[in-house]
């Protein structure tokens, strides 16, 4: 039994959920999201709540997945999503200009990344970068792309990491 799929989703008054063919659109105060919704899963919207059902037992995994995806879409258009990254290292700097972020992280050249549509990026300080948007997928993906430029290394801890990330430290070689 899909326990997640059986939970109802509370829909705030400021949000509208519409299904058009195989696509589902969620509109809210922060923006609008559209994504594919599997036709094997049906949903019923009434009294500000959405209930999900599936056509067969073999669609159990889809049931919970589609419910979780729709819940994150509603959360995104109401509150939005934000990830904060920290650059740790001597001379590591970040600058944001429009939808581009320029990272100076120890390479011979600056690394320039362009944020996808619907995602805003800003450098709150020289070593902090905030990625915000309504789509949980897009925000997480772009934050992961920034982190992948220079992932934290376990010996000195230098690199780009999420603010809440713990980097396990290792001891270096012991001399003779």
From Swiss-Prot:
InterPro entries: Ribosomal_uL6-like, Ribosomal_uL6-like_a/b-dom_sf, Ribosomal_uL6_a/b-dom, Ribosomal_uL6_bac-type, Ribosomal_uL6_CS. Keywords: Ribonucleoprotein, Ribosomal protein, RNA-binding, rRNA-binding. One of its GO terms (biological process) is cytoplasmic translation. GO terms for molecular function: rRNA binding; structural constituent of ribosome. It holds the Pfam family Ribosomal_L6. GO terms for cellular component: cytosolic large ribosomal subunit. It comes from the Bacteria. This protein binds to the 23S rRNA, and is important in its secondary structure. It is located near the subunit interface in the base of the L7/L12 stalk, and near the tRNA binding site of the peptidyltransferase center. Part of the 50S ribosomal subunit. Belongs to the universal ribosomal protein uL6 family. This is Large ribosomal subunit protein uL6.
């Amino acid at each position: 039994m899909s326990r997640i799929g059986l939970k109802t989703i509370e829909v705030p008054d400021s949000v509208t959920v519409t299904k058009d063919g195989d696509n589902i659109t969620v509109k809210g105060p922060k923006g609008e999201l559209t994504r594919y919704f599997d036709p094997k899963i049906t949903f019923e919207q009434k009294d500000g709540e959405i209930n999900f059902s599936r056509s067969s037992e073999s669609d159990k995994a889809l049931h919970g997945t589609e419910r979780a995806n729709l819940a994150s879409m509603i959360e995104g258009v109401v509150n939005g999503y934000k990830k904060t990254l920290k650059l740790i290292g001597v001379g590591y700097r970040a600058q944001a200009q429009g939808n581009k972020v320029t990272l100076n992280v120890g390479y011979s050249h600056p690394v320039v990344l362009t944020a996808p549509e619907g995602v805003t990026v800003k450098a709150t300080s020289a070593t902090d970068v905030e990625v915000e948007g309504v789509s949980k997928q897009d925000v997480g993906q772009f934050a992961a792309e920034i982190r992948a430029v220079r992932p934290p290394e376990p010996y000195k801890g230098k690199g780009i990491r999420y603010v809440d990330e713990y980097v396990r430290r290792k001891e270096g070689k012991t001399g003779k």
